[in-house]
Amino acid sequence: MEVIILWILNLINMSHYDTNLDKNDANYVPLSPLSFLERTKNIYPNYEAIVYESRSYTWSEVYKRCVKFASALEKIGVKTGDTVSIMAFNTPEIFEAHYSIPMVGAVINAINTRLDPKTINYILEHSGAKVLIVDRQFHEVIAKALENVKSKITIIDIDDKDANLSEYKKIGEHEYENFLNTGDENYEWKKPRDEWQAISLCYTSGTTGNPKGVVYHHRGAYLMATGSSVAWNMPNKLNFLYTVPMFHCNGWCYPWTLSMLHGRVICLRNIDVKKIFELIDKYEVTHFGGAPIVLNMLANAPKEHQKKLKRKIQVLTAGAPPPSIIFEKMKNLGFDVMHVYGLT
């Protein structure tokens, strides 16, 4: 009886907590993974953030580049709620796009690089893309995809100096680095007014009919980024080899997780077994993720490519479970593989 009375009194007193305790700037901030980059820039400005071939950037440099690119997007008319598409390999540009595009309030739409022109055309039309950032290597497929696009799309070329792109024509009116340098590094970027504001638009592939659009919001991306770090027991200052395509579910949301952990991102343009083992050795890689086919390539790589690992490396794989023999081979090479499954 005493317990019931206390319970009733608690219900009556609940109203006290509904008075003058509304959300305000002092007690509430919408969750957004953009806050990870801002924090890491402030606390670990000189930590190496991204390495790719001849290029490397610290976290303060990455932050500055993202802010400038966001500013440049606003200057050409991109605003909150607009879609900015990107079709690129795992180079620094697509990592930066996960911050620069939402910094102007827009939504990043990372397009699968293996799609045909008709499907890409559908995605550009359906998403209402205002801007398309694209690696020059995709000139042919993008040129065809743009033939029947009804609305004006501003094209920004990624001219990767570390790749031999001389045979590929320029597609757009802007080049990524030049465009970035038109932006203001002191630009006051836009934090989401509401954590349910869209941050990303992904499209399914391999489904019946046309691709299906899937919207991520700032809150969801924030929670996915933090949850992944806990589920995989990821430490600070890890060395992450980016083998998962960043167009695939936003690279499993690790562009946001890695800034939260002030890790080092080692970019990989193409899946190449010899290159993967070289990068693992050179940068003391601690973590990477990959589809089962990537694990199969590593497990069955020529012996001359399989460098002896200096430490156990954490590997995350998703999708169809790899055969048990692949798990065994990877374990014998020094990889600790964790299999997961998730939805777009």
Whereabouts are the PLM-identified features?
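Conserved AMP-binding/adenylate-forming core of the ANL superfamily
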Residues: 46-91, 95-99, 116-121, 172-177
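Gly/Ser/Thr-rich phosphate-binding loop
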Residues: 260, 285-290, 299-344
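Flexible, low-complexity linker/hinge segments
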Residues: 22-31, 143, 163-198
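Structural core segment of the AMP-binding/adenylate-forming
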Residues: 36, 75-76, 103-178
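Conserved pre-ATP/AMP-binding loop-to-beta segment of ANL
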Residues: 45-48, 156-157, 174-203, 210, ...
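A short helix-loop-beta submotif of the ANL/AMP-binding
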Residues: 82-83, 89-117, 125-131, 145, ...
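Conserved AMP-binding/adenylation subdomain of ANL enzymes
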Residues: 222-239, 247-287, 297, 301-302
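Conserved structural elements of the adenylate-forming
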Residues: 63-69, 181-186, 195, 200, ...
